[in-house]
Amino acid sequence: MKGSIFRHPTPLPLGVSSGYVMTVLGPLPISEMGVTLMHEHILLDASGKWVPPCCCSDRHLAEMPVKMENLGELSLNPLMSRDNCQLFDVDVAIEELTKYRALGGETVVDPTNIGIGRDPNALARIARLTGLNIIMGTGLYLEPSHPEWVRTSSVEQLTERLIYDLGGAEEKPEVLAGLIGEIGISSRFTPDEEKSLRAAGRASAATGVPIEVHLPGWERLGHRVLDILEQEGADLRHTVLCHMNPSFADKRYQRELAQRGAFLEYDMIGMSYYYADESAQSPSDEENARAIRELIDDGYIQQILLSQDVFLKTMLTRYGGHGYGYILKH
């Protein structure tokens, strides 16, 4: 992997055991992370999730910018608007994150990765201007978002790419990733998604950097994912399983995953959308709170992570959404 040599600390602290986490502005002691959101997209191109309406009468909404007149329709089917799936504006990101900072937020983990609009230099600028610690992801999301070169790459080649992004190679990028993820797993769990997951496991084993895995929340693929990561040498205690909210009622499933060491991430807090592509409603905050309370009562408080997974314009306060500060405010 070719890159430029930049001035990073030598030796570069890598992985959980180093006591540091890598932000877009450099290493930060884990003890100084403070109030942290573990799963929020700052800049993102989620156009791959865009599903134009099938009804002729709704097709005008597909290319309409997000505005007051279509917020109601987008609450019922948020992915039918291409514009809603695009977070491109750095100034809007700064405005939204400044509100989170004012509420006491200190760190944001942004799992936007390769192929879905990751912008390292812009994230570094946003971190400087907001005063927030921003941790950037690496790896691959769902197969439709994979760059063409992924199809012909081996697990070894993908692993090498991730290690480079994390600063584990001799040559390093200017802005380093501090997380492997969010690694995309679909309900079809395609061969290329498995290849990507195996590379993530190997890169984590080599560097000690944690992994975040996007699970199809209404499915039950958690054990299969953990089995593969275990085969590749990853430490399951440094593995985050995302989108656990939809499986909140399956107590046995979630507790079995936690017993294997994984973190359970309830990252759909405040999300009230109906997802037409899943024919499913996001769990309510009451359902989330009850499930989290029961996990705490059962002794899993150290393995629960909370976030809101901001990834649409309609989730930003500028467009009538809760923004990044919902958990801290409510």
Features from the language model and the residues they span:
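Alpha-helical scaffold segments that flank or form the walls of functional sites
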Residues: 38, 43, 54-112, 116-130, ...
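Short acidic/histidine-rich active-site segments
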Residues: 212-214, 266-268, 300-321
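Histidine/acidic-residue-rich catalytic or RNA/ligand-binding cores of hydrolases
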Residues: 46-48, 120, 221-227, 250-257, ...
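Glycine-enriched alpha-helix->loop->beta-strand junction motifs that scaffold or abut catalytic
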Residues: 131, 207-210, 230-237, 256-265, ...
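Mid-to-C-terminal alpha-helical segments outside catalytic/metal-binding sites
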Residues: 14-27, 31, 322, 326-330
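Distinct, well-ordered alpha-helical segments
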Residues: 121-124, 149, 190-195, 218-233, ...
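Active-site beta-loop-alpha junctions enriched in small/polar residues
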Residues: 41-43, 113-114, 139-143, 182-185, ...
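Active-site gating/metal-coordination segments in enzymes
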Residues: 107, 125-128, 133-210, 263
